[in-house]
Amino acid sequence: MTSRIQMHRTSPPPAYGTSAPPSGFTLGASTTSTLQRWALPLLLVAFGLFYLLPLTSHGLWIPDETRYAQISQEMLLSGDWVAPHFMGIRYFEKPIAGYWLIAIGQAVFGDNLFGVRIASALSTGLSVLLAYLITRRMWNDPRKSFAAALLYMSFGLIAGQAGYSNLDPQFTLWVNLSLVALWFALDGRSTRERLLAWAGLGVACGMGFMTKGFLAWLLPVLIALPYMIWQRRLGELVRYGLVAVLVAIGISLPWVLSIHAHEPDFWRFFFWHEHIRRFAADNAQHTRPWWFYLPLLVASSLPWAALLPGTFMQAWKDKRQAPTGFLLLWFLLPLAFFSLSRGKLPTYIMPCLLPLAVLMGSALIDRINAIQGRSIRINSLLNLLIGVAAMVALLYIQLTRPVYGHNEMLGLSLVFIMLMGWIIANLLPAARPLQYWPAPALGIWLLVALLPAGMPGFIVHNQMPDQFIKEHIEELRQTKTLLSNDLGAASALAWRLQRPEVTLYNTEGELKYGLAYADSAQRKVSMAEVGQWVSEARKQGSVGVVMRVKDVVESEEVALLPPGGKRYEEGNMLVLILPQSQP
């Protein structure tokens, strides 16, 4: 067994496995000091420009964003911060903490797009800060700290999810915090410092557990146990780990007991349906082959994908060094665990990307110090190829089968600007890789900032139904009863009107469990019942209907509704205003 490797920080650098920069390319003390002073402010400016400003530029995507917006808004409306409800119906697929943060965003900034998405953006920003801090702790090199934070902030999957309201950025933050705290605990110089870090680990595990479940406890153990065995520090894990366990229990126990008292079936459903069934059952949701995450890892790391081979080679070479070994365990073991699960979604591997960014940042700066820009140039040329191919495809499609109408030139212009920015951002490092290596980040930031706002109308009206609902909000607000045949459209309607009581027409989806309760059974009507239901509802007042019509069955659903009233159509979306019937 490898003997314990002492972890220590050197000041000033060089770091593990790093030779001094050759003559001809040096970063002097003043340059290093300047970078150390301005690294975080520069990243903060980029965060504001490319993460925060675009949050209000486009509607809510279905199904995730409308769901999380509505569930969190309903907590504010009902005052129930214990049991999650989706349009007034029990919804036990996730615990509560993720909804808390989205609800706080809406409470502070209002029931708007910024309020719904700010929790994801801030969670990602804090993860960027964690990447910076752990790299600084491991190598004490401002260049590596800046590189790791920049790479993480510009990984395609991370940047894309930062402006998307769901629970994965939050959960990723808690996992990242737990493992950064673990490293700080292991590398602490004093007992007080170690205890604080172990307590921080407990806070992260408790919040992660209340965001997405037991995985928040499993992942730190999955990394800590083999690492401590390797380092011959298992006794330390047992002694200090108890602090983290007690803090995690203290954080989560009040809600655990409260939800059990409010909804005794919550833990049965959540444990078996969301953990055991999703991981091992033959009928698991989102079933994918074991290798699903391998190509996805390459796509997720764009615009830095061509740096992956060099990163892995350098990491394997340095695997016996404590920082690199820790990061490799953090990257590989969760990736293997998620690959073994039957149910897979792209965002599940987000907790693997921070250690990848740190390893990549370290390897990148080592190559720059050694005046080795070949991999940077290859990476930029790959990105150039992608950008030029996308530009040619856009022009060809627009000329032959236009996807943008004559009144959508703004959207087309935004996409064109985004692609030109991507191309220019990669031309610079292709020409001078050692000087302009950070430039590809600008390309991906322009993409996540401009592409959603530049979507053609047929995507907006089909995938962001809240925008079509917003156009008819005043008429819908005056209706007495609401009906919808699609959960995404229904939740968008409920969120825009701040009215959870939307009756579901011939659909149940993820609300199947909640609709089985007797007090929610009346919230669904079938095709056979809809005629009578509408007739009764119109006696009480006007009825607002929002439909998504994508196939023959949904066309038949529309045909069963009574004629008359006001009718508005756009893409697959249909809004009907059925007036109150005369007595």
From Swiss-Prot:
GO terms for cellular component: plasma membrane. It is a multi-pass membrane protein. Its main location: membrane. The chain crosses the membrane at residues 42-62, 113-135, 145-165, 166-186, 209-229, 241-261, 290-310, 321-341, 345-365, 380-400, 409-429, 440-460. GO terms for biological process: lipid A biosynthetic process; lipopolysaccharide biosynthetic process; protein O-linked glycosylation; response to iron(III) ion. InterPro entries: ArnT_tfrase, Glyco_trans_39/83, LipidA_mod_glycosyltrf_83. It is an enzyme of class 2 (transferase). GO terms for molecular function: 4-amino-4-deoxy-L-arabinose transferase activity; mannosyltransferase activity. It catalyses: 4-amino-4-deoxy-alpha-L-arabinopyranosyl di-trans,octa-cis-undecaprenyl phosphate + lipid IVA = lipid IIA + di-trans,octa-cis-undecaprenyl phosphate. Catalyzes the transfer of the L-Ara4N moiety of the glycolipid undecaprenyl phosphate-alpha-L-Ara4N to lipid A. The modified arabinose is attached to lipid A and is required for resistance to polymyxin and cationic antimicrobial peptides. This is Undecaprenyl phosphate-alpha-4-amino-4-deoxy-L-arabinose arabinosyl transferase 2. The lineage of its organism: Bacteria, Pseudomonadati, Pseudomonadota, Gammaproteobacteria, Pseudomonadales.
